[in-house]
C-alpha cells in the first residue's frame, strides 16, 4: 500500500486545483438566462456576466498587463467590482479591492506596497485616487467606473470601464491555474497600528470559504443576495463566489441605508444579506416611513461583537433570522 501511495501522484486525470472562478463558467452554462446582477436600472444574466468577465480578462492582456500583476479597485458594491472577482483571476492576475474610506496617503502606500499596475476607480473617489497616484512611486493608470448617480464631470482624461471592456473579446481562454496555493487576492488591513498590512488569499482558501458560506447558512439554491457588506472587506467574505456557486442573484447596493435595504428586500424578495452589527441597528432603528413590510424570511449574517439581545429580538420580530459568526478580519 505504501508503494501505491508513493506512485499515486497528481495528474490531470485525478486532480484539479480548487478555483472559485469555475463557479461562473458552470452557472453560465447551466443557468444562462437567470439574473446574475441587478443594480438600479441595470441587470445582467449569468451568460452576460460570464461574457463581460471574459472580455475584461482579455482586455487586461491585450493592454499589456501580465500574469501575476496586481489590479486595484477603489469602488462601491457595483457590478464592476463583482465582475473583477472573476475577471482578474481569470486573467491570472491578483485583485486588490481597497477600502474606499481611506485617505489618499494610505491609498498611495497600498499602491506602492502592492506594486499596483492598474487602478479602477469609482467616480466618487476619483479625486482622492488622483491625489494618491500623484504621490505614489508606481503611478498606475486610472480607469474610471462611471455611474449614473455620480455624473460625468472631469473624466475626459480617463478611459471608462466600459470602453476598457470593449477592447477585449469573449473568446478569451482563461489562464490555467497551476497551483491552488497561488494568490487570488490581496487585501489590506485598516484600523490597525502603523501602515496597513497586506493579507494574501489563495485560490484554495477562497474556494473553500465560498462553499463554507453555503454550509454555514444552509443556503438554498438561487438565493437573492443583497450587497450590504463591502466587497473590499475580505472580498465580501467570499460571497461573490458563493452566489455564483448557488446560481443566485446579486442585488448591488451603492450606499447602505435602512430605506434602501427595506426597499430592496421587499422589491427583489431578498433572502440573504451580511453586515456588521451597525447594519442590524439600522434595520431595527429605522423609522416607520423607511420600513417596508415583507412576508418572506430574510437571513442575516453578522460578525464582530455579538448583537445585544434586544436587537436580535427586534430583528426576529421584523422578519429576519440572524446568524452570528466569528470574524477577525482586521
Language-model segments: residues:
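Conserved AMP-binding/adenylate-forming core of the ANL superfamily
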Residues: 16, 25, 33-78, 82-86, ...
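Conserved pre-ATP/AMP-binding loop-to-beta segment of ANL
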Residues: 32, 156-157, 166-188, 195, ...
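Conserved AMP-binding A3 loop
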Residues: 45-47, 184-208
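Gly/Ser/Thr-rich phosphate-binding loop
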Residues: 245, 270-275, 284-330
Amino acid at each position: 500500500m505504501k508503494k501505491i501511495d508513493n506512485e499515486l501522484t497528481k495528474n490531470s486525470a485525478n486532480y484539479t486545483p480548487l478555483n472559485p472562478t469555475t463557479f461562473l463558467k458552470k452557472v453560465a452554462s447551466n443557468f444562462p438566462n437567470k439574473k446574475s446582477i441587478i443594480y438600479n436600472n441595470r441587470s445582467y444574466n449569468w451568460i452576460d456576466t460570464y461574457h463581460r468577465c471574459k472580455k475584461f480578462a482579455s482586455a487586461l492582456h491585450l493592454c499589456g498587463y501580465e500574469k501575476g500583476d496586481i489590479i486595484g479597485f477603489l469602488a462601491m458594491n457595483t457590478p464592476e467590482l463583482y465582475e473583477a472577482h472573476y475577471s482578474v483571476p481569470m486573467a491570472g492576475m491578483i485583485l486588490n479591492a481597497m477600502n474606499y474610506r481611506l485617505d489618499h496617503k494610505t491609498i498611495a502606500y497600498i499602491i506602492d506596497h502592492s506594486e499596483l499596475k492598474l487602478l479602477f476607480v469609482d467616480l466618487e473617489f476619483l479625486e482622492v485616487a488622483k491625489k494618491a497616484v500623484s504621490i505614489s512611486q508606481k503611478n498606475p493608470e486610472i480607469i474610471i467606473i462611471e455611474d449614473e448617480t455620480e455624473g460625468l464631470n472631469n473624466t475626459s482624461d480617463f478611459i471608462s470601464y466600459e470602453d476598457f471592456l470593449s477592447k477585449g473579446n469573449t473568446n478569451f481562454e482563461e489562464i490555467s491555474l497551476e497551483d491552488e496555493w497561488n494568490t487570488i487576492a490581496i487585501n489590506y488591513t485598516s484600523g490597525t497600528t502603523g501602515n496597513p498590512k497586506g493579507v494574501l488569499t489563495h485560490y484554495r482558501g477562497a474556494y473553500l470559504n465560498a462553499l463554507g458560506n453555503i454550509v454555514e447558512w444552509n443556503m438554498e439554491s438561487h438565493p437573492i443576495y443583497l450587497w450590504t457588506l463591502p466587497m473590499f472587506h475580505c472580498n465580501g467574505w467570499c460571497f461573490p463566489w458563493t452566489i455564483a456557486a448557488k446560481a443566485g442573484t446579486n442585488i448591488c447596493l451603492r450606499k447602505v441605508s435602512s430605506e434602501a435595504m427595506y426597499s430592496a428586500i421587499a422589491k427583489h424578495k431578498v433572502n440573504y444579506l451580511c453586515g456588521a452589527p451597525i447594519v442590524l441597528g439600522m434595520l431595527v432603528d429605522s423609522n416607520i416611513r423607511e420600513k417596508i413590510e415583507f412576508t418572506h424570511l430574510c437571513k442575516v449574517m453578522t460578525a464582530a461583537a455579538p448583537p445585544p439581545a434586544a436587537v436580535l429580538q427586534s430583528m426576529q420580530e421584523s422578519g429576519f433570522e440572524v446568524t452570528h459568526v466569528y470574524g477577525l478580519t482586521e
